[in-house]
Amino acid sequence: MSVQILIGDVRERLRSLPDGSVHCAVTSPPYFGLRDYGMPGQIGLEATPAAFVEVMVDVFREVRRVLRSDGTLWLNLGDSYAASRPYQVPSTKGGAKHGPAQGAGGKRSTVPEGLKPKDLIGIPWRVAFALQADGWYLRQDIIWSKPNPMPESVTDRCTKAHE
């Protein structure tokens, strides 16, 4: 058995793999609106949740192409909160992480249409249902329970201790 870890933009790296050549894909794509890696066209800084979901569906169509017929996909995808604030959030290039309600990329964050400020956006559910509609099997959700989660400064909801 061999393991190969591919590093780079998934949209480019997957194209180099032959059809049906992957036994198992394990991934944690950038979460929507939470981090700026300082790369043009990066995943996670789409203008809307719907645009992010569309990108994820496109990416996972390519994952499906390279997976063997008996292959499996393991996807870890966290959520984010709707926020609207009048100031610029600086880039996180270099590794600093935004808090869960902050926009990324030095852009003013806005509340996505149909949501209210502080709403949990439901990105993992939106992506899961979109992938299911695109032909993927949704077999199980597995909770990653974190006994020592990252502290948060929020006072109007519980600290997130799972993904």
Predicted regions mapped to residue ranges:
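Core catalytic lobe of class I
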Residues: 1-163
